[in-house]
Amino acid sequence: LVVLGMTGTGATILSELLAQDPANRPLMKWERLSCCPPPEAASFRSDPRIAKAVGEVEFQYEMVPELRAVHYEPGDGPTECVALLGQSFYSQDWLGLFRVPTFVDWYRHCDKGPAYEYHHLALQLLQSRTGGRWSAVTRCAGPTG
């Protein structure tokens, strides 16, 4: 199940709702922050990486308190797949972090196929020991993608 939504349309809350269905397998924030080794089914809810991710996210909210109200995404909850695309640098997230006109131009015209191939492989890796049906939520590329 893949859900696409423009920024600010509720895709994040939809990912939370889809994650409530035990048949769905969302990408978890802690997995995205630390993909390897892939999680084990037996320790999926108690993996030590969860506490680390929760701490990292809480630190981020301490540094920028307004962020919690604008985009709340707990370290032990689901996250958008756009984060995996960022690992291959084919993500619109990079456009908002730095002002690099040459990157913007490259991103607008590049072949994004390799990014989705990487995304597919990353999801396969993460699912290799846990199984389940993915419920992937991501933002649309918008005018720059």
At which residue positions do the language-model features occur?
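Hydrophobic/aromatic-lined pockets within catalytic cores
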Residues: 19-26, 124-127, 131, 144
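Glycine-rich phosphate-binding P-loop
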Residues: 2-24
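Conserved alpha/beta-hydrolase fold motif
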Residues: 3, 135-136
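Short beta-strand-centered segment that lines the nucleotide-binding/catalytic pocket of NTP-utilizing
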Residues: 25-34
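ATP-dependent NMP and nucleoside kinases share a basic, alpha-helical "lid"
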Residues: 138-145
